[in-house]
């Protein structure tokens, strides 16, 4: 079984990827999306969103990283895919699942679910552009506002030449509602396709992973929010390990606060650690106490001081 760290825009940034892969055995990470509009992006854009490219596409602990592209123009997607591969990306992932209103309003992400033909053309363009030894993957949801086109969407991905597909078990309209998860439909998609299907959605603990594998018939899982709730989730899912103790999480947070970020405006780590603590609070009561301690922080220096307080 592979466990893949999902792309989460504005959450699973390079620094979080670095920290999570240090304490796990993730098989692959997907980056936050690189937005492609109508031109070939400069190298610095790829390096900013995927600094691992400067390390041959690996995190410092050796986990391969795959660049995700978001866009609607097949030709431009293909041109930027070639650049990402040349810089060291371990394949290319196409975003057809982001539910953000801003992204969808520009006809990107989940908006493509309404246009299976465009998914096909985009996937085909990527496959033709990317050398055959590099995988092309596509991340989708089950549909836009219902699951009636789930098979058509999946067929478009496979017929476009994708190596594998990740299926999030909800529609765009479902958002992240727990009661809307549909692993059964993922199973039906898997039975229909000949390429590997990676299951995604509502995988928080070891038992969730076992249930998802059983109900979908998939061999691989992708996790996002759960990886923030339990920082060693990959170990938990693969070997039923105990969740990481809080004192180890404190060390991770302190390390994150001390990472130098050349793109930081001064408030970056403050906002991100507050955000992470909200996820951790779902599994650790101590997260609330730490949040209360840092909630008035406005600078990185103040944050470091308070996190180091006993």
Curated annotation (Swiss-Prot):
Record flagged with keyword Cell division: no
Residues with site note (Interacts with tRNA): 35, 95, 176, 272, 274, 279, 295
Name of the coding gene: dusC
Protein name from the UniProt record: tRNA-dihydrouridine(16) synthase
NCBIfam families recorded: PRK10550.1 (NF007838)
Keywords: Flavoprotein, FMN, NADP, Oxidoreductase, RNA-binding, tRNA processing, tRNA-binding
Stated role: Catalyzes the synthesis of 5,6-dihydrouridine (D), a modified base found in the D-loop of most tRNAs, via the reduction of the C5-C6 double bond in target uridines. Specifically modifies U16 in tRNAs.
GO-annotated molecular function: flavin adenine dinucleotide binding; FMN binding; tRNA binding; tRNA-dihydrouridine16 synthase activity
Organism: Haemophilus influenzae (strain ATCC 51907 / DSM 11121 / KW20 / Rd)
Gene3D superfamilies referenced in this protein's UniProt entry, alphabetically: Aldolase class I (3.20.20.70), Dihydrouridine synthase, C-terminal recognition domain (1.20.225.30)
Required cofactor names: FMN
Pfam families for this protein: Dus
Record-linked InterPro entries: Aldolase_TIM, DUS-like_FMN-bd, DUS_fam, DusC, DusC_C, tRNA_hU_synthase_CS
Native organism taxonomy: Bacteria, Pseudomonadati, Pseudomonadota, Gammaproteobacteria, Pasteurellales
């Amino acid at each position: 079984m592979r466990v893949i760290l999902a792309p989460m825009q504005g959450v699973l940034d390079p620094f979080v990827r670095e920290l999570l892969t240090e304490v796990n055995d993730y098989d692959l990470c997907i980056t936050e999306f690189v937005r492609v509009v109508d031109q070939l992006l400069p190298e610095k854009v790829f390096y900013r969103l995927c600094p691992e490219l400067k390390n041959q596409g690996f995190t410092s602990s050796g986990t391969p990283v795959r660049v995700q592209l978001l866009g609607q123009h097949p030709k431009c997607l293909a041109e930027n895919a070639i650049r990402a591969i040349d810089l060291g990306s371990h394949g290319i992932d196409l975003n057809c699942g982001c539910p953000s209103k801003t992204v969808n309003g520009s006809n990107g992400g989940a908006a493509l679910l309404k246009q299976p033909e465009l998914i096909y053309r985009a996937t085909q363009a990527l496959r033709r552009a990317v050398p055959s030894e590099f995988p092309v993957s596509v991340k989708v949801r089950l549909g836009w506002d219902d699951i009636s086109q789930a098979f058509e969407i999946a067929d478009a991905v496979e017929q476009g030449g994708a190596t594998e597909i990740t299926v999030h078990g909800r529609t765009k309209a479902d958002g992240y509602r727990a009661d809307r998860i549909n692993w059964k439909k993922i199973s039906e998609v898997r039975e229909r396709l000949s390429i590997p299907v990676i299951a995604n959605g509502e995988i928080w603990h070891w038992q969730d992973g076992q249930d998802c594998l059983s109900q979908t018939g998939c061999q691989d899982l992708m996790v996002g929010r759960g990886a923030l709730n339990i920082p060693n989730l990959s170990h938990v899912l693969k070997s039923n390990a105990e969740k990481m103790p809080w004192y180890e999480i404190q060390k991770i947070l302190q390390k994150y606060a001390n990472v130098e970020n050349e793109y930081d405006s001064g408030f970056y780590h403050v906002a991100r650690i507050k955000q992470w603590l909200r996820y951790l609070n779902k599994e650790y009561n101590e997260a609330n106490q730490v949040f209360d301690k840092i909630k008035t922080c406005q600078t990185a220096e103040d944050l470091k001081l308070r996190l180091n307080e006993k």
